[in-house]
């Protein structure tokens, strides 16, 4: 919501100010790399109804076994150098799935954008979309 200052609702993903089990579907498109993803994942799980769906996209390098993050990297310039963008705090590796599952989500599916979907949905070619479910 910080990108769109005119948003109807602005929420802190690390401390979502709504009651438990309020949403059927949540789309988190390129936000988890900006926040404490453990806190955010727990909050997303809390506000989803049982069986609710989390659709998620993050910058990920599948060839990396582990997520790259370093709390000592704090300047915008250094974050841009290390994480590709000045407000990112990590670059995910193949362990991304397990990081989200550790919060209680079940990985239902994942898609790699290609062909007509790239244009139709405004995705980057080769971008991963993950679909998790509250178990």
Locate the predicted segments by residue.
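Short alpha-helix
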Residues: 84-110
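A broadly tuned preference for mixed-charge, low-complexity surface segments
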Residues: 19-31, 80-82, 105-112
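Exposed loop/turn and edge beta-strand positions of beta-sandwich/beta-sheet ligand-binding modules
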Residues: 22, 86, 125-126
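Core SAM-dependent methyltransferase catalytic element
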Residues: 103-135
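Conserved aromatic-histidine-acidic binding/catalytic patches
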Residues: 32, 36, 84-88, 120
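SAM-dependent methyltransferase
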Residues: 66-87
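Conserved SAM-binding loop
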Residues: 1-73, 94-100, 129-135
């Amino acid at each position: 919501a910080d990108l769109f200052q005119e948003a109807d609702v602005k929420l802190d993903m690390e401390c979502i100010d709504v009651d438990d089990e309020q949403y059927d579907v949540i789309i988190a498109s390129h936000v988890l790399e900006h926040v404490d993803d453990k806190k955010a994942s727990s909050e997303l799980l809390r506000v989803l109804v049982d069986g609710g769906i989390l659709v998620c996209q993050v910058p990920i390098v599948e060839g990396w076994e582990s997520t790259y993050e370093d709390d000592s990297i704090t300047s915008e310039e250094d974050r841009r150098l290390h994480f590709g963008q000045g407000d990112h705090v990590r670059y995910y590796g193949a362990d991304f799935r397990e990081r989200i599952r550790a919060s209680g989500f079940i990985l239902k599916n994942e898609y790699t954008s290609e062909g007509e979907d790239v244009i139709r949905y405004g995705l980057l070619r080769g971008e991963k979309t993950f679909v998790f479910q509250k178990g």
